[in-house]
């Protein structure tokens, strides 16, 4: 059994959720570190949902962040304002990696990210006109924000799945019931102006080392 202890200050801890993880316009001043940003070809899946993906390519050594980037990361923000025939959009984050030292860790992706997006239409017989805006942080020695905007039309006749998006979907974190994680327990204890979170879990060997990520919401 491995244990992780973490203090969370009360101002940030109104709710706690634990997650175990075994056309684009770009301002010229933002181009440093960013090699390319596009939307992957979209398609209509058998369940009536559309899939597309944000494809981000960074310069060598540059990183971008996961949905919960850690204390020192830059939280991403993705919005769909102005889209038509769109009932729901779900961003499906692939499993990330952990960067940095023991005292300053961040969570994200190195040099390339394909970020799948599942879109539920209001009327499945009509196309979706997608308007997507994204605010992301990219980092080498220092971190800088980038602002992206895309337009894409997804038509019911588009039914050929994009292989890059499918590959990214295969790397999404799995629910606990589908993992080999055993004997998971979590305790929250008040401690002065913070909450002490203690987590214990039997983590199967994945190779060199295993990382436990706590996501706060």
Stretch-by-stretch model annotation:
Residues 1-12:
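N-terminal secretory signal peptides that target proteins for export/translocation
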Residues 3, 18, 48-49:
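Generic hydrophobic alpha-helical membrane-segment signal
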Residues 7, 17-19, 105, 131:
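Generic detector of short alpha-helix boundary/capping microenvironments
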Residues 13-25:
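Bacterial N-terminal signal peptides
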């Amino acid at each position: 059994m491995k244990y992780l202890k973490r203090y969370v200050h009360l101002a940030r801890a109104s709710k706690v959720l634990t997650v175990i993880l075994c056309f684009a316009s770009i301002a010229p001043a933002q181009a440093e570190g960013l090699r390319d940003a596009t939307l992957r070809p979209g398609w209509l899946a058998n369940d009536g949902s559309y899939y597309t993906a944000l494809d981000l390519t960074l310069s060598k050594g540059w990183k971008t962040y996961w949905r919960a980037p850690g204390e020192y990361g830059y939280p991403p923000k993705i919005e769909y304002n102005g889209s038509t025939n769109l009932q729901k959009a779900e961003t499906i984050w692939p499993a990330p990696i952990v960067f940095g030292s023991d005292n300053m860790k961040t969570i994200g992706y190195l040099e390339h990210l394909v970020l799948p997006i599942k879109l539920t239409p209001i009327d499945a017989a009509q196309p979706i006109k997608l308007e997507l805006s994204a605010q992301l942080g990219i980092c080498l020695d220092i971190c800088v924000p980038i602002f992206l905007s895309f337009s894409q039309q997804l038509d019911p006749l588009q039914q050929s799945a994009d292989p890059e998006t499918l590959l990214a979907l295969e790397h999404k974190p799995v629910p606990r019931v589908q993992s080999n994680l055993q004997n998971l327990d979590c305790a929250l204890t008040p401690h002065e102006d913070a909450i002490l979170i203690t987590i214990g879990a039997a983590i199967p060997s994945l190779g060199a080392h295993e990382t436990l990520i706590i996501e706060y919401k």
